[in-house]
Amino acid sequence: MKWETVIGLEIHVQLNTKSKIFSSALTKYGKKPNSQACAIDLGLPGVLPVLNVEAVNKAIRFGVAINAHINKRNIFDRKNYFYPDLPKGYQISQMDWPIIGKGKIEIILGNQTKVICITRAHLEEDAGKSIHDMFDDNTAIDLNRAGIPLLEIVSEPDMRSAKEAVAYTKKIHTLVQYIDICDGNMQEGSFRCDANISIRPKGQKELGTRAELKNINSFKFLERAINFEVKRQKDILEEGEKVVQETRLYDSIKNETRSMRLKEETNDYRYFPDPDLLPIEISNELLEKVKQTLPELPDQRKTRFVVELGLSEYDADVLTSQKSLADYFEVMLEDNIVNIKLCANWVMGELSAALNKHQIDIQNSPITAPALSLLISRISDDTISVKTAKDVFKYMWDSKNSADEIIKVRGLKQMTNMVEIEVIIEQVIANSTLQVSQFKLGNNKILGFFIGKIMELTGGKVNPKQVNELLRKKLL
């Protein structure tokens, strides 16, 4: 039997506010456990929540960015369940009247474009964190995360493969960074998702029984987890068994999912309006203000890179996939608009490779955008070859000296005296009679031998293109 995969995602975006959504406690990551949890976060008797308006504004920014319906009046509800890292015994969330209604995101896979519909996006508070490996027989609770504002973005079950799910998640990840509502740090849990997965016979409209994979914080893990879960469900159904509706956890080391608990239904949470919080009223003036302050969005920037800068769709897509990467590239162009393609190649090539190797963000790159732009200029004006430029790049990375300083101190400037270059070429030809004969018999590959010898004699300080042209003239 042929099966169809059905995937819906719930993406949890930590909003980058300075204080929590219902208290004045700070939201900095990595602080001493329970040092950023106040009486409200601890759920102590007699305390009342106070809404952080900045969290509301950031949620609206997302809604406007995806052209979604903004609910002018929305309310907070209590989601009741017991868990050790939820001290109040309930989570403040939004059920019937979320801040963001229906919207959509467009993804591209290969040459295919697909629209993924968004059901809703609602504000809620994050829970604390249970730490199971700190003590042998006990679980530690850190409530620093409790109360951090979350925007939960819920998609329709519109995705049909793991690759579509990853493309959608990456699109949201890029967008929330562009509009500055989240830092997107998946390692620190600022951006994570739950995947609801089911399968059904191809052509059937009714959805199958779903399993929910919780708290996935990596694009790679998301793809692997979905693929494993789809295979698991297929195996169960093809053996004549039934899939159980449950919550599962992905084990990235074993590359498998395992059961956590049976999946709760909405009624199990006994939602009801929070009596301590007034409804949120959103005015037309506020919506207009948010629209006016919205920056250039990723798709708009990509289009501009293609239309105005002449980049390919692929290059523009890579460069705009991270706001910081696109910003770096545009700073390079401020002094190097004549070398757009060369700048793009170096950002996507040498720079990205070095950043990945050393596992650092582009914001912390030891080579600044103006510094790399200068290096590109030295390739463009034939001061150094591309090969030499790669060596200069490594010296720049380690020393933080400028390209010009390194070229001067190390004597890397290309030879420009054509008379001297011709003498060296003639010397190589005179000492390579066998190779000359092979070339004249039609072996063009032997040119690499000559160029290698010339590079060796000049210490790589000649322009390979010029050498190639001169060499051909001398040999013919």
Swiss-Prot record:
InterPro entries: Asn/Gln-tRNA_amidoTrfase_suB/E (IPR017959), Asn/Gln-tRNA_Trfase_suB/E_cat (IPR006075), Asn/Gln_amidotransferase (IPR018027), Asn/Gln_tRNA_amidoTrase-B-like (IPR003789), GatB (IPR004413), GatB_C_1 (IPR042114), GatB_Yqey_C_2 (IPR023168), Gln-tRNA_amidoTrfase_suB_CS (IPR017958). Gene3D superfamilies: 1.10.10.410, GatB domain, N-terminal subdomain. It catalyses: L-glutamyl-tRNA(Gln) + L-glutamine + ATP + H2O = L-glutaminyl-tRNA(Gln) + L-glutamate + ADP + phosphate + H(+); L-aspartyl-tRNA(Asn) + L-glutamine + ATP + H2O = L-asparaginyl-tRNA(Asn) + L-glutamate + ADP + phosphate + 2 H(+). Keywords: ATP-binding, Ligase, Nucleotide-binding, Protein biosynthesis. GO terms for biological process: glutaminyl-tRNAGln biosynthesis via transamidation; translation. SMART domains: GatB_Yqey (SM00845). It comes from the Bacteria. The keyword Protein biosynthesis applies. Its EC number is 6.3.5.-. Heterotrimer of A, B and C subunits. Belongs to the GatB/GatE family. GatB subfamily. This is Aspartyl/glutamyl-tRNA(Asn/Gln) amidotransferase subunit B. It comes from Vesicomyosocius okutanii subsp. Calyptogena okutanii (strain HA). The lineage of its organism: Bacteria, Pseudomonadati, Pseudomonadota, Gammaproteobacteria, Candidatus Pseudothioglobaceae. The gene is gatB.
